[in-house]
Amino acid sequence: MNSLSNIDFSKLSLFESIIVASQAIREDFPSHSVLTELKNRIKEAESYISSENEPDRKLEKLLQLFYTQWNFGGASGVYKLSDTLWIDNVLKTRKGTAVSLGIIFLHIAQSLKLPLNPVVFPTQLILRADWINEKKWLINPFNGEILDQHTLEVWLKGNISPTAELYENDLYKSESITVIRKMLDTLKAALMEEKKMELALNVTNLLIKIDPNDPYEIRDRGLIYAQLECNHVALTDLIYFVEHCPEDPISEIIKIQIHSIEQKKTILH
């Protein structure tokens, strides 16, 4: 397991960061077999697209290989959200989320020198390919489909607000650290929902390493500590949140939680 103190995301690629983060969260994360499988898939992809000369045709063939031949795609039926986020599991089942599928596809495409970048759109991760003629493709990592402006506007209105509008900066390339945070935030929520509190705590500690003073991450860590009955440290974190975000409506709920923990401590003593 990687020590949190040794991780420096600024020196790692997006894919390396996700592997290192997964090792830090899960002792049994099989990074060697994940890297070996991806190396083999990159070799296969290189051969599959080699008959094409133009980058856009190469990317078209890679999309066909990934989503049709290899059959990667979104999960359906009954499943645990965390199972669709762990990269080792996604490689095994070929079912993932926009962010996990996007990270795998992006790693393969970039290894093949294709001009693809991540975009943390307000509703989900999308992939952006920029071509020499200034045209761009926006790709849905769930299924490999090319997205048009109308679809993106519908997503915004359906998920954010009926009055939401699509702005150019919604489609700007995102920094790796933004994608990592998106992935870790989703994973943390999934693990908390699944009551895997020790793993959720590891995720939260990683997020706090990225932004040590984020009161919302500190609040979540406090809530996880409370679930684990580590009441002393839970109180410290929850009080920090209330002091730093007094105007947040959630603060009133957190104050009740603080009072409940303090009552428990009084009874125990």
Swiss-Prot record:
Q: Which Pfam families match?
A: TPR_9, Transglut_core2
Name the source's superkingdom: Bacteria
Q: List the InterPro entries.
A: SirB1_N, TPR-like_helical_dom_sf
What family classification does the UniProt entry report for this protein? Answer: Belongs to the UPF0162 family.
User: PANTHER family in the record, alphabetically?
Assistant: F-BOX ONLY PROTEIN 21 (PTHR31350:SF21), SI:DKEY-261L7.2 (PTHR31350)
Q: What is this protein called?
A: UPF0162 protein BU173
Q: Which species is the source of this protein?
A: Buchnera aphidicola subsp. Acyrthosiphon pisum (strain APS) (Acyrthosiphon pisum symbiotic bacterium)
Taxonomic classification: Bacteria, Pseudomonadati, Pseudomonadota, Gammaproteobacteria, Enterobacterales
